[in-house]
Amino acid sequence: MAGLAGPAKPSLALNPQEDSQFEKALTQIQGRTKKPQQKKKEKLNRGVVYLGHLPSTLSESHIYNYCAQFGDISRFRLSRSKRTGNSKGYAFVEFESEDVAKIVAETMDNYLFGERLLSCKFMPRKKVHKDLFSQRNALFHRPSFPAVKRYNRKRGHLQMLKMEYRFKKKEKLLRKKLAAKGIDYSFPSLVLPKPKNIAVAHRDSEGNQVLPDQKEGLSGEPRRKEKMMKEDISNNIPKKRKRSRRKKSSVDSQGPTPVCTPTFLERRKSQVMEVGGDKDDEIILKLPVPPVKEDTQKTPTSASPGGKRPRKRKSKQ
């Protein structure tokens, strides 16, 4: 039994002349016993679908699970902003079958999804770029802008000196290049000049200051003209009228008749009434002087409009 163990030896015919026939019969028997070969799978053409007008709240998992209901998905990419990482509102889905992709494009176009009408279109092979799905699984990292951070960082005194030295060196090279090409162009220095002492700068500013002439005013005109201009302006401004607190004259046409005293008569003599505007047309009226009595006459007084009685004056004795 130990001699029978091992790999199977090739079968040989008992009659060497019938060896060829024996091999043919053996191959036929082996062909019958073998399992039937599986049919080769047909290669399916893949189809890409463009999805637009997507809500910004949807993520990759939501869209992938929704589109997987129609068929197998080979690749998927949701476009995102490189600066913020937010969704741009469109995506690309690649199905394993082109027929499935066309069916999805027909059924999902103008479909109301999240208060928006989806734009779903089938993309032919010519329009599909080879790098369309290159960054489909890349994780988003917020950009750091290292160059901007380096430029805006706080520098010490030694670093500032090094920076000024580099700027001066670049400025010299630039001026040499312009001079070599025959370009006469002057531009300010890249490094600001160092500020001088405050006291020295103040003196220089006072020395270079142009003060107005003593004979001239602040406006540049002579002082006499300036004074006349101020007077003209003040005269043109209307002045407020002051309320006169002078007592009204004792003579009133509507009031009670005054007492005829010597002083009253002298005052009446001196009054002059003007009839016209010219001096030649003036008429002077002189009233006759009545006889003066020692006792003053008592004149009857009319009742005042307010209802108050006038005070009685005591007669002089």
Curated annotation (Swiss-Prot):
Disulfide bonds: none annotated. Residues 203-317 are annotated as: Disordered. One of its GO terms (cellular component) is nucleolus. Expressed in brain, heart, hind limb muscles, intestine, liver, skin and spleen. Residues 47-125 form the RRM domain. Pfam families: hNIFK_binding (PF12196), RRM_1 (PF00076). The keyword tRNA processing does not apply. There is a cross-link at residue 293 (Glycyl lysine isopeptide (Lys-Gly) (interchain with G-Cter in SUMO1)). Keywords: Acetylation, Chromosome, Citrullination, Isopeptide bond, Methylation, Nucleus, Phosphoprotein, RNA-binding, Ubl conjugation. The modification Citrulline is found at residue 203. Residues 238-248, 308-317 have a biased composition (Basic residues). Its main location: nucleus. InterPro entries: NIFK_FHA_Ki67-binding, Nucleotide-bd_a/b_plait_sf, RBD_domain_sf, RRM_dom. The modification N-acetylalanine is found at residue 2. The modification Omega-N-methylarginine is found at residue 116. There is a cross-link at residues 40, 181, 194, 293 (Glycyl lysine isopeptide (Lys-Gly) (interchain with G-Cter in SUMO2)). The modification Phosphothreonine is found at residues 257, 261, 301. It is found in: Nucleus, Nucleolus; Chromosome. Residues 213-233, 265-284 have a biased composition (Basic and acidic residues). One of its GO terms (molecular function) is RNA binding. The modification Phosphoserine is found at residues 219, 253, 270. Binds to the FHA domain of MKI67; this interaction is enhanced in mitosis. This is MKI67 FHA domain-interacting nucleolar phosphoprotein. It comes from Mus musculus (Mouse). The gene is Nifk.
